[in-house]
């Protein structure tokens, strides 16, 4: 077994990973940057793929693909404890995030990850705010991802980019505590060996520079996707905007933070996603935000509301028979995230699916406690195999994190929704804690 020693000096025994060992035999590390990222990220990925029953062939394919494409896209390695560019994805400033997707009606879990593509030009005079990294990466990797289409990606990138002659102004106005990120890219690693790419656009650079709100930038960009045949996102946008108008105090209003699309060819009913941050510290507030104050209705919404209620009661140990439990404050200062997945339609009614993201590192619970709560949840929803191994899987994937001890923050968010096809649908987002253990 391999012995790993993190920056805190405590040694941990890492589980042998035969597929990773096989991949390692066939590669020659050609740079210190690639060697650093591979050393930090390959073992968790290999462990998660193995634990979640991907075939050997598919595991080898994904590990080799990851080495070939993702490591260079992460850019130069950190130096002297500081990242090369300084963008981040997670609360602990890691530029990478894993996730594990669970569907109630499926026996398989899907591994995913998110990055921000960075180049040697990022942060230099050639590309001061990293507006080129994502495009360069996706154009290159698209040759190796069948079905990838960048039409809408390019449209959204242009809509949220800062004009070249205004970049200096944007930098001067940019608050020090704001993230430097421009575009995130995520991949779903399907068990078939096929990849699904998604892109996420942060509009805050453009908003700061132009004085136009992020809500307006994203709303206008979505409206530009309406079609001449009458299919549009107007019904969904109108429902969202009508709900936002009910907040009379700007500081209490949900804030739009991300616009997302799937990097595939557009089809009728193509989905777009908008992300809002909101102070949903009680279940009552979360449900109001989830259904846009009652604007989203029907059996599918009823099932979703029941699902998030049941999980909320389970997570916080509340009594579902006590009406007061819906108004009990359970989350601190950090805001929850609501994702409105809109599909184009011919009518005026909204066509929206919603996901609710809870900030797990803010709950006063260790990763071990969260793992045990999730295990009992999976057990009660027909997944005893996942329940029995979830905590140990995390401990194996992240041996430096001390999952069974007092670790906090490996779980970043957990999202939940419900669809007729999947039943309950949850994603556990996981930080590799790169600054803590590798910088």
UniProtKB/Swiss-Prot annotation:
The family classification in the record reads: Belongs to the tryptophan dimethylallyltransferase family.
A Gene Ontology annotation in the biological process aspect, one of them, is: alkaloid metabolic process
Organism, by scientific name, is: Pestalotiopsis fici (strain W106-1 / CGMCC3.15140)
Reaction(s) the record says it catalyses: siccayne + dimethylallyl diphosphate = pestalodiol + diphosphate
What Pfam families would the database entry show? Trp_DMAT
EC class of this enzyme? transferase
Q: What does this protein do?
A: Prenyltransferase; part of the gene cluster that mediates the biosynthesis of iso-A82775C, a enylepoxycyclohexane and biosynthetic precursor of the chloropestolide anticancer natural products. Within the cluster, the prenyltransferase iacE prenylates siccayne to generate pestalodiol E, using dimethylallyl diphosphate (DMAPP) as cosubstrate. The probable oxidoreductase iacF is then involved in the epoxidation of pestalodiol F to pestalodiol F, which is further converted to pestalofone A by the short-chain dehydrogenase/reductase iacG.
Concerning InterPro entries, the annotation shows:
Aro_prenylTrfase (IPR033964), Aro_prenylTrfase_DMATS (IPR017795), DMATS-type_fun (IPR012148)
Sorted UniProt keywords: Transferase
Q: Per its record, what triggers expression of this gene product?
A: Expression is co-regulated with the other genes from the iso-A82775C biosynthesis cluster and probably controlled by the cluster-specific transcription factors iacI and iacK.
Pathway involvement of the protein, from the record: Secondary metabolite biosynthesis
* Molecular function via GO: transferase activity, transferring alkyl or aryl (other than methyl) groups
**What protein does this entry describe?**
Prenyltransferase iacE
Q: Which Enzyme Commission number(s) are on file for it?
A: 2.5.1.-
């Amino acid at each position: 077994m391999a012995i790993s020693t993190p920056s805190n000096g405590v040694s941990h025994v890492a589980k042998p990973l035969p597929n990773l060992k096989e991949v390692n035999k066939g590669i020659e590390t050609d740079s210190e940057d690639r060697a650093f990222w591979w050393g930090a990220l390959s073992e968790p990925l290999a462990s998660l793929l193995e634990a979640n029953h991907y075939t050997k062939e598919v595991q080898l394919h994904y590990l080799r693909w990851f080495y070939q494409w993702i490591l260079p896209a992460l850019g130069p390695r950190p130096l002297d404890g500081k990242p090369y560019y300084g963008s981040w994805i997670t609360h602990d400033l890691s530029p990478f995030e894993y996730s594990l997707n669970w569907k109630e009606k499926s026996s398989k879990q899907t591994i995913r990850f998110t990055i921000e593509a960075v180049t040697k030009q990022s942060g230099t005079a050639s590309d001061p705010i990293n507006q080129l990294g994502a495009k360069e990466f996706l154009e290159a990797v698209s040759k190796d991802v069948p079905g990838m289409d960048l039409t809408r990606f390019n449209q959204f990138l242009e809509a949220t980019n800062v004009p070249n002659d205004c970049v200096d102004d944007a930098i001067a106005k940019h608050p020090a505590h704001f993230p430097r990120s421009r575009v995130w890219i995520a991949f779903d690693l399907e068990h078939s060996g096929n990849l699904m790419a998604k892109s996420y656009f942060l509009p805050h650079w453009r908003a700061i520079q132009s004085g136009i709100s992020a809500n307006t930038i994203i709303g206008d960009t979505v409206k530009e996707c309406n079609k001449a045949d009458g299919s549009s996102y107007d019904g969904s946008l109108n429902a969202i905007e009508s709900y936002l108008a009910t907040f009379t105090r700007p500081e209490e209003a949900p804030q739009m933070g991300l616009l997302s699309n799937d990097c595939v060819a557009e089809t009728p009913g193509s989905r777009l996603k908008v992300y809002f941050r909101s102070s949903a510290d009680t279940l009552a507030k979360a449900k109001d935000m989830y259904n846009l104050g009652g604007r989203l209705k029907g059996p599918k919404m009823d099932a979703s509301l029941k699902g998030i209620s049941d999980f909320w009661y389970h997570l916080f140990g509340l009594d579902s028979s006590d009406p007061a439990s819906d108004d009990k404050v359970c989350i601190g200062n950090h805001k929850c995230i609501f994702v409105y997945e809109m599909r184009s339609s011919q009518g005026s009614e909204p066509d929206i699916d919603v996901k609710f993201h809870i900030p797990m590192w803010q709950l006063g619970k260790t990763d071990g406690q969260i793992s045990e709560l999730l295990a009992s949840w999976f057990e009660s929803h027909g997944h005893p195999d996942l329940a029995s191994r979830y905590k140990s899987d995390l401990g194996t994937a992240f041996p430096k994190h001390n999952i069974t001890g007092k670790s906090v923050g490996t779980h970043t968010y957990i999202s939940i929704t419900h669809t007729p096809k999947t039943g309950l649908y949850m994603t556990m987002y996981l930080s590799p804690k790169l600054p803590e253990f590798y910088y």
